[in-house]
Swiss-Prot record:
Classification via Gene3D superfamilies: YVTN repeat-like/Quinoprotein amine dehydrogenase
Listed name of the protein: 6-phosphogluconolactonase
InterPro entries: 6-phosphogluconolactonase_YbhE, Cycloisomerase_2, Lactonase_7-beta_prop, N2O_reductase_N, WD40/YVTN_repeat-like_dom_sf
Class of this enzyme: hydrolase
HAMAP family referenced in this protein's UniProt entry, alphabetically: 6P_gluconolactonase
Pathway: Carbohydrate degradation; pentose phosphate pathway; D-ribulose 5-phosphate from D-glucose 6-phosphate (oxidative stage): step 2/3
GO molecular function: 6-phosphogluconolactonase activity
Catalytic function, reaction form: 6-phospho-D-glucono-1,5-lactone + H2O = 6-phospho-D-gluconate + H(+)
High-level lineage: Bacteria, Pseudomonadati, Pseudomonadota, Gammaproteobacteria, Enterobacterales
Free-text function comment from the UniProt entry: Catalyzes the hydrolysis of 6-phosphogluconolactone to 6-phosphogluconate.
Signal peptide residues on this chain, from the entry's feature table: none
Keyword match Hydrolase: yes
Organism of origin: Pectobacterium carotovorum subsp. carotovorum (strain PC1)
Length: 332
């Protein structure tokens, strides 16, 4: 499998494009100068475009991906608020942007040419909205609102409009601060990392009824940790066996084993990583994890032990200033 890793560095306004080798080694393919502070990124489901959000002029840029994974800018469209997180629906027809400072979610159409257009809907009053996450059925969008201690739920209509789901929200404990999410590949469970208490919630999805239920909450930090909690990102391996969470204060990756059915997590260890790991990701084989240090100006590649989920450091690579986002593309 040929894979490419994209790393967004907003302080130097760059995207570094790396080829990921079979042994986890990275080779630099391209450095893209971006017209703005590039932060969130998402790869189109058909793998032909990369969408990136920029500041301080709030826009989304559409980059065409060639056969090697290199990028060429192909389009630009406005966004109603500073983009904190970008995602698409599973069919690649709509782009969702969450704006933490703007307290809003917007929906933008994606044309047949893969280029994002101007927004067609804006939902306001979502305090501290930190991400938008389409569920595996492509019917419900989850929007964690950190300042509200709840995840708002919306139905996705045929033309891209969002309307309040019949179960309008899922609440966390007070002060948890829900942030980013991941879904189990069996489509029955969702996981949300909470920024302010560095915990993770497990939610069960009932496909037949559409009802949701929180079934577990776990602390992601080592026993006795008494510093400020500041969790950031969450990802699950493609086979659904291991889940990881980053914390920026401790500069740690928390390692969880996932039960066979996806319903329960077990914290098994912690891996020191790059300073202030704002973003990380897992490759499409589930063998490698790439962590970005927002304060170290480096990324680090780890091998994932397929029996335990433990992380073995392989190599570090210098990138741009303040790296915040990592996306991994499988070319074949």
């Amino acid at each position: 499998m040929q894979q490419v890793v994209y790393v967004a560095s907003p302080e130097s306004q760059q995207i570094h494009v790396w080829q990921l080798g079979a042994q986890g080694n990275l080779t630099l393919l391209q450095t893209v100068d971006v017209p703005g502070q590039v932060q969130p990124m998402v790869i189109a489901p058909n793998k032909r475009h990369l969408y990136v959000g920029v500041r301080p002029d709030f826009r989304v840029l559409s980059y065409r991906i060639d056969e090697q994974g290199k990028l060429t800018e192909a389009g630009v469209a406005s966004l109603p608020g500073s983009p904190t997180h970008l995602s698409t629906d599973n069919d690649g027809r709509f782009l969702f942007s969450a704006s933490y400072s703007g307290a809003c979610v917007s929906v933008s159409p994606i044309g047949a040419d893969g280029i994002v257009g101007e927004p067609i809907q804006q939902l306001d009053g979502l305090e501290g909205c930190h991400s938008t996450n389409i569920d595996p059925t492509n019917r419900v969008v989850w929007a964690p609102c950190l300042k509200e201690d709840r995840i708002r739920l919306y139905d996705l209509g045929a033309t891209g409009e969002l309307s309040v789901h019949r179960q309008a929200e899922m609440t966390t404990v007070a002060g948890a601060g829900p942030r980013h999410m991941a879904f189990h590949p069996n489509q029955r469970f969702a996981y949300c990392v909470n920024e302010l208490d560095s915990s993770v919630d497990v939610y069960q999805l009932d496909a037949a009824s559409g009802e949701l239920e929180k079934v577990q909450t776990l602390d992601a930090m080592p026993a006795g940790f008494n510093d400020t909690r500041w969790a950031a990102d969450i990802h699950i391996t493609p086979n659904g066996r291991f889940l990881y969470i980053s914390d920026r204060t401790a500069s740690l990756l928390s390692i969880f084993q996932v039960s066979e059915d996806g319903s329960a997590l077990t914290l098994t260890g912690h891996q020191p990583t790059e300073t202030q790991p704002r973003g990380f990701n897992i490759d499409n084989t589930g063998e490698f994890l790439i962590s970005a240090g927002q304060k170290s100006q480096h990324i680090e590649v780890y091998h994932i032990d397929q029996n335990t989920g433990d992380l073995q450091p392989l190599a570090r690579y210098a990138v741009g200033q303040g790296p915040m986002w990592v996306s991994v593309l499988a070319l074949d």
